[in-house]
From Swiss-Prot:
It comes from Rattus norvegicus (Rat). InterPro entries: Hemopexin-like_dom, Hemopexin-like_dom_sf, Hemopexin-like_repeat, Hemopexin_CS, M10A_MMP, MetalloPept_cat_dom_sf, Pept_M10_metallopeptidase, Pept_M10A. Induction: By epidermal growth factor and is increased in FR3T3 and RAT-1 fibroblasts transformed by polyoma virus, Rous sarcoma virus, or the human cellular H-Ras oncogene. Ca(2+) 3 binds at residues 173-174, 176, 178, 196, 199. Residues 1-17 form the signal peptide. This is Stromelysin-1. Its cofactor is Ca(2+); Zn(2+). Its main location: secreted. The gene is Mmp3.
């Protein structure tokens, strides 16, 4: 039997704490051996161990593994250790620098290209594109880094799906266990990320969530090693999240990536905060009030703006708490008590609606030629007010909600789609007939009605969570 001396010595050192029998014992020892070889640097041709258990190389490696993964350091193959070893994880080893690869490799530039070479069949292409884009955004939010996607040629980060042996001499192992692996920054295959296509990739909490795994692997592509902090994204063992909408990096992740690239710097693409005198005390409008509702909600360059009366909260992944400002401190001509707001990302423009008029802004700039009549969009004259609006980047469509109906606008053709309006209840079951605001995050749509918020999965076509409107404020 290949590796028999290793397995015999492993059993001598660690069997006593994990009662196994026959083939089960052999299987457990083989799992341990491979785990220590793959992730903790155990030599594959170990022929001699000292007879004293607490000084054997195997016991020391078990203790090293237990310490890193946050387990009790028994030096034995106990049930907690065995359970954790069977959980899905990243294929990158755990030994090395605490938060970065040895030598701290990093990209020597702040703008990095990526390319999605091929796609899994588990998800629509647009869902894969969105998951990768959001995963990179997680790191972009806390660094000076920016990312752009190319469709052909060699990118800094090449992203692909593969099974078993796939050309890098580190084969995948089929469903479960190793989910993906990635390489540190550098030329050639360095920086690339590979995903095991034998997994069942999803964009929700069933199966293996592509966004969460991609965010972890792309951390490696940027130079981060595994973290021993179980709360960190860079912890090696996969942890499913039931609240993808409020996902944020741990401080450990932020400290690690900023040790390589520094904190984010303000640029023309970032909304600059006004002077302190224009920033308000949130107690002016209690953001954690159970009765809080919003006039409109929109994204703006990766942030989320929550509008209420003359004010708005600005929520960014960079800060745990939202800022609170007067609308006029950013955009003096915009109306208060607006009806709806939405961002068209490929135009870098946010549109504000009140009554039968529409305004347009780009960062701090209020665009010339506005306000215009909402009827220039093709809405009928009978519509004098929009309740809520959202533009979906993948579809290049904008949805306008009016009472219990909605219209759909084609951003590419710049015209209303035929066969609209349609009933909200038929296309968004469970949402109800009153929509105050809506925006998209992490592949879900968030509909606001009064002080309530509904998380809607557009792929499943159903409501997945009922939340308070201010759940984004850590209340």
């Amino acid at each position: 039997m290949k590796g028999l001396p290793v397995l015999l010595w492993l059993c001598t050192a660690v069997c006593s704490s994990y009662p196994l029998h026959g083939s089960e014992e052999d299987a457990g020892m083989e799992v341990l051996q491979k785990y220590l070889e793959n992730y903790y640097g155990l030599e594959k041709d170990v022929k001699q161990f000292t007879k004293k258990k607490d000084s054997s190389p195997v016991v020391k490696k078990i203790q090293e593994m237990q310490k890193f993964l946050g387990l009790k350091m028994t030096g034995k193959l106990d049930s907690n250790t065995m359970e954790l070893m069977h959980k899905p994880r990243c294929g990158v080893p755990d030994v090395g620098g605490f938060s970065t690869f040895p030598g701290s490799p990093k990209w020597r530039k702040n703008h990095i290209s990526y390319r999605i070479v091929n796609y899994t069949l588990d998800l629509p292409r647009e869902s894969v594109d969105s998951a990768i884009e959001r995963a990179l955004k997680v790191w972009e939010e806390v660094t000076p880094l920016t990312f752009s996607r190319i469709s052909e040629g060699e990118a800094d980060i090449m992203i692909s799906f593969a099974v078993e042996e796939h050309g890098d001499f580190i084969p995948f192992d089929g469903p479960g266990m190793v989910l993906a692996h990635a390489y540190a920054p550098g030329p050639g295959t360095n920086g690339d990320a590979h995903f095991d296509d034998d997994e069942r990739w999803t964009d929700d909490v069933t199966g293996t969530n592509l966004f969460l795994v991609a965010a972890h692997e792309l951390g490696h592509s940027l130079g981060l090693f595994h973290s021993a902090n179980a709360e960190a994204l860079m912890y090696p063992v996969y942890k499913s999240s039931t609240d993808l909408a409020r996902f944020h990096l741990s401080q450990d992740d932020v400290d690690g990536i900023q040790s390589l690239y520094g904190p984010p710097t303000e640029s023309p693409d970032v909304l600059v905060v006004p002077t302190k005198s224009n920033s308000l005390d949130p107690e002016t409008l209690p953001m954690c009030s159970s009765a809080l509702s919003f006039d409109a909600v929109s994204t703006l360059r990766g942030e989320v703006l929550f509008f209420k009366d003359r004010h708005f909260w600005r929520k960014s992944l960079r800060t745990p708490e939202p800022g609170f400002y007067l609308i006029s401190s950013f955009w003096p001509s915009l109306p208060s008590n607006m009806d709806a707001a939405y961002e068209v990302t490929n135009r870098d423009t946010v549109f504000i609606l009140k009554g039968n008029q529409i305004w347009a802004i780009r960062g701090h700039e209020e665009l010339a030629g506005y306000p215009k009549s909402i009827h220039t969009l093709g809405l009928p004259e009978t519509v004098q007010k929009i309740d809520a609006a959202i533009s979906l980047k993948d579809q290049k469509k904008t949805y306008f909600f009016v009472e219990d109906k909605f219209w759909r606008f084609d951003e590419k053709k710049q015209s209303m789609d035929p066969e609209f309006p349609r009933k909200i209840a038929e296309n968004f079951p469970g949402i109800g007939t009153k929509v105050d605001a809506v925006f998209e995050a992490f592949g879900f749509l968030y509909f606001f009605s009064g002080s309530s918020q509904l998380e809607f999965d557009p792929n499943a076509g159903k409501v997945t969570h009922i939340l308070k409107s201010n759940s984004w404020f850590n209340c």
